[in-house]
Amino acid sequence: MSQIKPSRLSSSAEIRGARQLDVLQRHKLAEPQQDWLAEEVPVALVYNGISHVVMMATPKDLAAFALGFSLSEGIISSPQEIYAIEITPGCNGIEVNIELSSRRFAGLKERRRAMAGRTGCGVCGIEQLDDIFRPITPLPFTQAFNLEHLDTALAQLKQVQPVGQLTGCTHAAAWINPEGELLGGCEDVGRHVALDKLLGIRAKQPWQQGAVLVSSRASYEMVQKTAMCGAEILFAVSAATTLAVEVAERCNLTLVGFSKPGRATVYTHPQRIK
């Protein structure tokens, strides 16, 4: 399997996922110059030779994305159920070929048959509210976080956004320990993809105590993905949706929105927050 390492800040000469283009800047006078733009490419996740989904993503940390997506979508329950990940760039995008165990591949094929005929716009085709929620084992209450350390974590978030610092165009997802230290993280033009990348990296690291911190809002998908991977606390820099709060309540996840210096809004299960 491709090696997965925590992302850290790189020099601009080493930046992957961004390109310089000629632009016309207007301040007082219009002047031609170069500017950095974040890359966005189609990325196909292919399981045992069958294309499962195509996502728009920043082309970095794609092995981590494949592992995190597989875990957060319930395709696998352990990294050991993926035997290999191979990344193949092409003319129209990137293929990430994932070799699944035979048992998990059989489960994926059955799941694809059950979804046949549904449209591809999220919850379209679902007949009742309960069908929206992926079966998630309620999380235990083993974690705690002191909000005094949140400012420390927020101050470090840009460390995992080298492309974002150049372009202003990426979301970040990071793992922070109970002292607010940022242990690692990822960025992407898509907030869900950034989170999947982080969850893939975390699956290969001994990070148990701590929480997820994302630079975006918290949608119900973000909550489900976090809970599916066993993380008990999710901090979002922006707001949470009503459905995100409902899902968090159901699966025992502590959801915190408006995570900014000196403030935070705890929506669910505040017993983990000090």
UniProtKB/Swiss-Prot annotation:
Binding-site positions, Mo-bis(molybdopterin guanine dinucleotide): 258-263
Location of this chain's protein in the cell: Cytoplasm
Keywords, comma-separated and alphabetical: Cytoplasm, Molybdenum cofactor biosynthesis
Parts forming coiled coils: none
GO molecular function: sulfur carrier activity; sulfurtransferase activity
Signal peptide: none
A biological-process GO annotation: Mo-molybdopterin cofactor biosynthetic process
GO CC annotations on file: cytoplasm
Active site: 121 (cysteine persulfide intermediate)
Family of the protein in this entry: Belongs to the FdhD family.
NCBIfam families linked to this entry: fdhD_narQ
Role this protein plays: Required for formate dehydrogenase (FDH) activity. Acts as a sulfur carrier protein that transfers sulfur from IscS to the molybdenum cofactor prior to its insertion into FDH.
Name under which the protein is recorded: Sulfur carrier protein FdhD
Species annotation: Yersinia pseudotuberculosis serotype O:1b (strain IP 31758)
This protein's encoding gene: fdhD
